[in-house]
Amino acid sequence: MKKVSYQIVITVLTIFLSALTASSQVCVDCHKNNTPNIVSDWQLSKHSKNEVACSTCHGDEHNSSTNVELAKIPTPDKCSECHDDKVEQYKKGKHALAWAAMKAMPTAHMQPMALMEGMKGCGGCHKIGMKTESEIKELKKQGAGFGVASCDACHTRHTFSVQEAKQPQACQTCHMGFDHPQWEMYSSSKHGVRYLLKQNKTLPENTAAPTCQTCHMQEGNHEVRTAWGFLAVRLPLPDDKQWADDRVTILQALNVLDPDGKPTPRLDIVKAADVARLTQEDWQKERDKMVKTCNQCHSANFAKGELEKGDNMIKEADRLMAEAIRTVAGLYKDGVIKKAKSYTYNFPDLLTFHDAPTEIEQKLFVMFLEHRMRTFQGTFHANPDYALWYGWSEMQRSLTEIKNLAVEMREKTKKRK
């Protein structure tokens, strides 16, 4: 009886796999002519070796050039059917919230559609975030229904390679440039140089050389998060009174606190997007994880000391940033700058970015999003040149320009009176 049952199972499985193979072959035969590199990529992938057919991810409704719209575009939930643990980790981390964080920016709706939903600007990287079914439907209506899978931001289609996603270059497309040049910092730091020399075989294969993933995805954990978050602000406030005052000023300029220091509705958005650690316990958890990672090559005391230098550079950068913000806020208070219609408060709003309404606020935004970022990111990424010349030095120059421009604006206002 057991022998008969076993034979039935084998027969059913054989029929199923044969049907799966036949179904895939139909797709392959057509797409070899229309999109041949998709086919060759899939054939190189582990998917093709493990009977993960085209229909497994795209469904079987699309079967000709006349009904292309019926091809389903995979989402993380589809990937979770086989990779449940990794998708669950991803959903708990910051990457899953990237799309929501982009949409939450106060002037996101003012940007060209091609840059946002069209994924040629902000959306091109923030597409890694989770999207609702209604958002995906709307994207399709706008002709931008591709690239919603999230996982393929790192495991690019149609090879979906784990080895590719383990390389630091997998992070390079998004973690570079104006406000987050982590690639430039990492690749020219000793950490990055050692790994790149390891890649080109100058250094032996077993050389210790960390990648982005070594530090930020320990043991392959997809729940990516950092202690200081993207903007290097957190709660609770520090014991140091000056630093606490400076951080409050920055939180006010982010409109997370109002000019009186009271929480605003934007704080709820910050909480939902998990862009900052809001308890000491949450911050310490991430710090301890990082120290453990560093401890693979360095003593724990050395690692803690180096990370504390990063904390101290945030403190120093906040001193300059807060002074610049207060200078501009004073112009609002004294009526030199009139509140823009789109503004909630009579106070600068750093999250309006390049849509800031005055020249001095444009300088303030660049000081915050470019120069302050490079000051602390350069320190944490072990890149002295970025921390100093691209960060701290530029902050000093920006502060001087802002203070001088504020004096000019006040003088012009006096003359008009």
Where are these regions (language model features)?
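Positively charged n-region of N-terminal signal peptides that target proteins for export
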Residues: M1-Y6
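Short sequence/structural segments immediately N-terminal
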Residues: T21-K417
